[in-house]
Amino acid sequence: MDFPTRFDVIVIGGGHAGTEAALAAARMGVKTLLLTHNVETLGQMSCNPAIGGIGKSHLVKEIDALGGAMAEATDKGGIQFRILNSRKGPAVRATRAQADRVLYKAAIRHTLENQPNLWIFQQACDDLIVEQDQVRGVVTQMGLRFHADNVVLTTGTFLGGLIHIGLENYSGGRAGDPPSIALARRLRELPLRVGRLKTGTPPRIDGRSVDFSVMTEQPGDTPIPVMSFLGSKEQHPEQVSCWITHTNARTHEIIAANLDRSPMYSGVIEGIGPRYCPSIEDKIHRFADKESHQVFLEPEGLTTHELYPNGISTSLPFDVQLQIVRSIRGMENAHIVRPGYAIEYDFFDPRDLRYSLETKVIGGLFFAGQINGTTGYEEAGAQGLLAGANAALRSQGKDSWCPRRDEAYIGVLVDDLITLGTQEPYRMFTSRAEYRLILREDNADLRLTEKGRELGLVDDRRWAAFEAKREGIEREEQRLKSTWVRPNTPQGDAIAERFGTPLTHEYNLLNLLSRPEIDYAGLVEITGDAVDNPQVAEQVEIRTKYAGYIDRQQEEIARLRASEDTRLPVDIDYLGISGLSKEIQNKLNQARPETLGQASRIPGVTPAAISLLLIHLKKRASGRQLEQSA
């Protein structure tokens, strides 16, 4: 049977990628369907109960700047907030929040159910309707057909999902949920490169069976940070601490003695796991010289005793898991509520995608999240928003959009994936970005909100707050620039005494703020007229202190942008370009890069090859001009 309503965009999956994709498309005014196998699991945090961290919070803030839901849901569900790298420069500072799973999921569901243009339907998707290399809709488990020319797949770990505990395994999308077998089989029929990846999760612990008195308490920061640009600490629920303990020699002995019972080390698991979130057995094997590893006990929520022991993800048999847990200080009598496990799943080579996250072989079919080889809620949410927005743009007959590497971490993420591909679950770090001084988490709105408004992603409430902030920054910078302090005056003497900086002549306050020893709060305490908005004060201080470095980075970006953005024709014949080696011809022909900049980042493509490409493009353009004049 055909569903009576035709949609512009259909999103498959209600995880972090799917919810952001559906919300983005609906915000842009197109008729959107979110199809999920279970409405009760919309926005569920399948692994650790945390949002943000190094590189990841930058993505969350960018999602927020573009009108997404993740940051605001974190503020409503966050039970501990911390700023990581707070003593380092602003480029690498990151916000991290522990979240109450129930509160976070409720916030996401509330947002979904109150979003205009968005329909939600509970059914598993088993098939795609494809006609002449163009997607036309989907078919559910009960044979119901939904029609749309744009479909976003956000299947997480469900495609061919296989759960491992010891040498036993069974089909599943995650613990308690069925896998997507029929859809996985259908996707494998398409001309797309497919592989297997693996991720894992630790056993959950009953907090009543833990001795916290022998552990190190890790409270949140004061004052409490916020995640969203629209957030406030008044939104936060009760705040709680995490606790730190360590593995020990006994723990490592138990693991080493049972590696033959590990599905990873016995060859049962074929998929590659995340390098930067390894299982405890992987840590013991790879870092055999380390005597201990940290374990962070993270509360799962305010209304449960469950704890998430971050650092001991494992797929060893349950009896070994119990020995491991009880060998750790403070957990000698611990009760395991849920066993840890590993899960293998299908992913598709992201090099088969365009910058819009649309597949190159099937028009209107978009992929986002773990299906593209990434790991993490934040990476998934960022891709989901972009894919949903581009699906909406396509339905409106408009050009696709993706931020450049110098505009957003989302741009870095997508460019890395579609240019380089990935052999292991991809995680975002600040070190992946060349222009991280410009791509700070604190200025994500200044970089992206205006574009989001243009696309239709940003509502009036966010736009008004953004304009007020932007105007506040400009006004305060102008005030500091036009306010002067002279030596041998009460203000001049107070500045000299507080900062140890005698004034030799007249300075404006902006000049003084550029000095490393002078901070904004201390300066305006002496001179008066501080701004009320802490986001404005933060921006003024960072922009002033790092102005020289930022200007140099902007100049470098401007130099590179001309060649970076040069489009490569869809029909270009790389095999016919003389001067290119066969190896480079084949690499370019396989990757089919969209721009010269993307071509330059393909492994093995040399600067000389890029120069030859540029010459070829100029010859091609001049040849067409001659044809037109003739």
From Swiss-Prot:
GO biological process, one term: tRNA methylation
Keyword line: Cytoplasm, FAD, Flavoprotein, NAD, tRNA processing
Chain ranges passing through the membrane: none
Primary localisation category: cytoplasm
Gene Ontology cellular-component annotations: cytosol
Cofactor(s) it depends on: FAD
Annotated localization: Cytoplasm
Residues that, per the record, bind FAD: 13-18
Pfam family, one: GIDA
Residues where NAD(+) binds: 273-287
GO molecular function per UniProt: flavin adenine dinucleotide binding
PROSITE patterns: GIDA_1, GIDA_2
Subunit: Homodimer. Heterotetramer of two MnmE and two MnmG subunits.
Family, as annotated: Belongs to the MnmG family.
Role noted for this protein: NAD-binding protein involved in the addition of a carboxymethylaminomethyl (cmnm) group at the wobble position (U34) of certain tRNAs, forming tRNA-cmnm(5)s(2)U34.
HAMAP family listed in its UniProt record: MnmG_GidA
Descriptive protein name: tRNA uridine 5-carboxymethylaminomethyl modification enzyme MnmG
Organism expressing this protein natively: Pseudomonas aeruginosa (strain LESB58)
Lineage: Bacteria, Pseudomonadati, Pseudomonadota, Gammaproteobacteria, Pseudomonadales
Recorded name of the encoding gene: mnmG
